[in-house]
Amino acid sequence: LTIKVVTDSTADLPPDLIQKLDITVVPACVIFGNKTYRDGIDISQDEVYHKMITENIPASTSQPPPADFADAYQKLLKDADEIVSIQATSKLSGLCNSALQGKNMVDGSNRIAVVDSLSVSMGLGLLTLMAARLAKAGESLPTIIEQLKESIPRTRLWGFFDTLKYVLQGGRLGKAKALLGSVLPIKAILTMRDGELHPTGAVRTRTKGIERLIDNFKKAVNVQDAAVVYSTTPDDAQTLKERINAISDKIPVYISRLGPALGVHGGPGTLVLALREKVANLNQEIKDGEKLKKRISLPSLHRPKLNSFCL
């Protein structure tokens, strides 16, 4: 069976990995004034941050229409047997709901599983990479979904924000907004927990912010892989990657750039650290579709329940 993997542009995946692992990315929408752009297609990261810094144009985002997901699914099902579509947290975005609606517009919708990652940026990205490697290795849809279910609660994400201005304007803070409504010149650290953003600290300098991200990495257990995401400061991202490699040099650490859809909420200077902890008792590792010798059989799942799967 051939399984294709779909995600949305808020995953912030590096382009080379998208191509290498044959991942389909449905773009979210970025809105500046009265103009709507497709994330990464009609507008680039540089253009977004230029508008934010120099033009001071109010920005917002929206999920793609269900038809965009339906079109992607229909094209893939011409050659694929099944699809797993992994989306940004449903608690902060309508992307998962849009994907579910798009699925229901497609003939053969029972061959599509939609999964709520309960994360964003490379938290979603790391889960998507895992699913794509499993699919490339020939794993079944139930196995991929089972491993996603195991990995989602073990995927961690922290964001360092140079300013709270864009975070507060974006309206995605939920419970964190009341705690971050201060006008003090602080730089906030937020974490993703149960699909929502929560404040976890504040610092007054970028250096201290990077140290906080490093401290969070040190507290993680059995890290499988990690990612550093930046908006406008690639040197800081490289420094953070090198610091992580110095602590744990055996895990892959990806660097990517915060895409337009999340960039308008994070703003210039944002740094994100995402990591995925190993699943307990899982004696298996997949690398770019090559199966290693040590394997375990995962419990089978009742297939009909997977067809509308959304965590």
Each language-model region and where it sits:
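Mixed-charge interfacial surface used for oligomerization/domain docking
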Residues: 4, 10-24, 29, 92-113, ...
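N-terminal glycine-rich anion-binding loop in soluble enzyme alpha/beta folds
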Residues: 4-63
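Glycine-rich, highly charged phosphate/nucleotide-binding loops
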Residues: 62-72
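Glycine-rich phosphate/diphosphate-binding loops that line cofactor/substrate pockets in enzymes
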Residues: 71-81, 216-222
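Ordered, amphipathic secondary-structure segments that act as subunit-interaction surfaces
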Residues: 75-88, 94-97
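Short, flexible active-site-proximal loops enriched in glycine and acidic residues
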Residues: 80-83, 111-115
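Positively charged N-terminal leader segments that act as targeting/secretion signals
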Residues: 288-306
